[in-house]
């Protein structure tokens, strides 16, 4: 992975992820091949915070059809990043 911005693709904004922000847990969509160490280094480099823990999950592709053509959606990887207690809050919502 060349760049921290190549690893962290975008924040995941759902009702559950917004509620977890009060506990200093932030959810990001990340590159499927990125390891937890690479994700930790990328978050610390981009936002300037300390990461305590990272949980990752890979969502399965779903079968989709467009007319007679069948295919699958892309595989996605999400990372739930827990910050240390003394870290500042991330303000990527604006």
UniProtKB/Swiss-Prot annotation:
GO terms for cellular component: ribonucleoprotein complex; ribosome. Keywords: Ribonucleoprotein, Ribosomal protein, RNA-binding, rRNA-binding. One of its GO terms (biological process) is translation. The keyword Cell inner membrane does not apply. It holds the Pfam family Ribosomal_L23. Belongs to the universal ribosomal protein uL23 family. This is Large ribosomal subunit protein uL23. It comes from Exiguobacterium sibiricum (strain DSM 17290 / CCUG 55495 / CIP 109462 / JCM 13490 / 255-15). The gene is rplW.
């Amino acid at each position: 992975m060349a760049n921290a911005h190549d690893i962290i693709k975008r924040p995941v904004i759902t009702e559950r992820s917004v509620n977890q922000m009060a506990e200093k847990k932030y959810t990001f969509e990340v590159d499927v091949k990125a390891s937890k160490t690479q994700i930790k280094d990328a978050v610390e480099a981009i936002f300037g915070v300390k990461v305590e823990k990272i949980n990752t999950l890979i969502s399965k592709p779903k079968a989709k059809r467009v007319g007679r053509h069948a295919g699958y959606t892309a595989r996605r990887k999400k990372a739930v990043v827990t910050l240390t207690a003394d870290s500042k809050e991330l303000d990527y919502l604006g």
